[in-house]
């Protein structure tokens, strides 16, 4: 298997960094609310990998945070408490430690996610045929 690399631009350092990724098809990407952890979904190996972000912006300490996700992980978003929302067979919600705490059943497999509305309490979800609007008690983490 060929190693894939991801280029990540971190604002603090204003430089791009290549992040070694030990499988193919890295897909979704998100940052923790404090900007200290980078999350990347892996479509081929059905994982979420986490990287620590050093002070200079370098991603280090790659680790598999979540494995054996049912379905093919695609989009990922983080709420203001650091919980991860992973679009796969349905939307799986994980704690920052990688423990599944909830799931949101969809009528079709979701592909990507975005926080929206004035309070960022709505998760917009794209799928094959529709874009869904899911009202949540959680609030999105604005990262971009």
Label each PLM-derived region with a short phrase.
Residues 116-117, 121-142:
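Short glycine/proline-enriched turn or capping motifs at secondary-structure junctions
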Residues 4-7, 46-48, 91-92, 131-133:
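Structural signal for beta-propeller blades
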Residues 1-10, 142-144:
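Blade/loop signatures of beta-propeller domains
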Residues 43, 53, 89, 128, ...:
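Short loop/turn segments immediately following the C-termini of beta-strands
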Residues 8-25, 52-69, 93-106:
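Blade-edge beta-strand/turn elements of extracellular beta-propeller
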Residues 1-6, 15-40, 68-83, 87-88, ...:
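Beta-rich, blade/repeat-based domains predominating
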Residues 51-58, 135-143:
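Short loop/turn segments immediately following beta-strands, especially the blade-tip
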Residues 30-51, 55-63:
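Glycine- and Gly-Pro-enriched alpha-helical subdomains that act as flexible
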């Amino acid at each position: 298997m060929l190693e894939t690399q991801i280029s990540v631009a971190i604002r603090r350092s204003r430089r791009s960094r290549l992040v070694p990724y030990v499988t193919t098809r890295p897909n979704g990407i998100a940052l923790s609310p404090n900007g200290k952890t980078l999350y990347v979904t892996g479509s081929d190996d059905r994982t979420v990998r986490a990287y620590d972000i050093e002070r200079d912006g370098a991603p280090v300490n790659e680790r598999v945070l979540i494995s054996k996700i049912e379905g093919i992980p695609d989009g990922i978003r983080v709420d203001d408490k650091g919980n991860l929302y992973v679009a796969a067979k349905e939307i799986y919600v994980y704690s920052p430690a990688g423990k599944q705490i909830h799931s949101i059943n969809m009528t079709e497999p979701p592909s990507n996610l975005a926080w929206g509305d004035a309070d960022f309490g709505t998760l917009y979800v794209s799928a094959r045929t529709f874009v869904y609007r899911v009202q949540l008690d959680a609030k999105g983490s604005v990262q971009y």
